[in-house]
Amino acid sequence: MEPESIEDYYERIAAHVGADGRLPVAVEEMPGWDIFPYEVDSLRLKPLQPPAATEPARRGEDAAACWCANPVDPDSDSLMWWNERWKVDLGFEGSGLPIMAWLSPLVHCDLGTMPPAVAAELGSLVGTMAGAIEGLPSVGRAQLAKYGDGGAHLHLLLMGRPARMLQLRGSPLLDWEENLPRVPSEVLASNGRPVARALAEAHGGWIGPAAQR
Ligand SMILES: [Zn+2]
């Protein structure tokens, strides 16, 4: 059997929608767990939409129009650490978590198109960051995400899940994050500093303004 088409995938799902075009909320699954941010009684899914005609272009799909066409700005407020091949930005536009840091290679690629040398270094960088994030007093666990539906250039999100706040465990962490009050930027900087230092120690490079305020 060949891998199925998206039309077949969609049709199988669409067969389960009710008269209002919605799938039922899976109360026996994660929506019913204690880590889910919303109460099931007041919840309904949005009407299911069919596949679009094409995948939309993402920001920086063309390398010439991507941020990586310009050198790293060492004065950038969001820059936490960088070296000759990688950079880490802090989420200064707002974070409800103790730390949210974006790791990107400076060479233009996505996860599926990484040059072998970039792929080889990625694991070690993620390990350094996760260890330093889990060393923060307000963090219980480091989480790692790769989405890439908005920007074409590879960016991995490392998040610090607040320590002992067990409701915030698992994949709903980002949904919680959107609803949490913002962490002050000076607190984000002091949490980012040990992570930037660990990166500089293990991978060279420089600590940026976001970890120095
Ligand atoms: Zn790029």
Task: List each language-model region with its residue ranges.
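Histidine-centered divalent-metal-coordination microenvironment in nucleic-acid enzymes
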Residues: 105, 147-175
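A short glycine-rich, hydrophobically flanked beta-strand micro-motif that places a catalytic Asp/Glu
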Residues: 137-150
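Secondary-structure boundary elements
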Residues: 131-138, 201, 205
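Active-site helix/loop of acyl-thioester processing domains in fatty-acid/polyketide metabolism
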Residues: 120-136
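Active-site microenvironments that recognize anionic phosphate/pyrophosphate groups
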Residues: 1-98, 206-213
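Glycine- and small hydrophobic-enriched segments that form the cores of compact globular domains
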Residues: 75-89, 110-117, 121-125, 149, ...
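C-terminal helix-cap and adjacent tail motif
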Residues: 47, 162-213
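Short histidine-centered catalytic/ligand-binding loop motif
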Residues: 101-125, 176-184
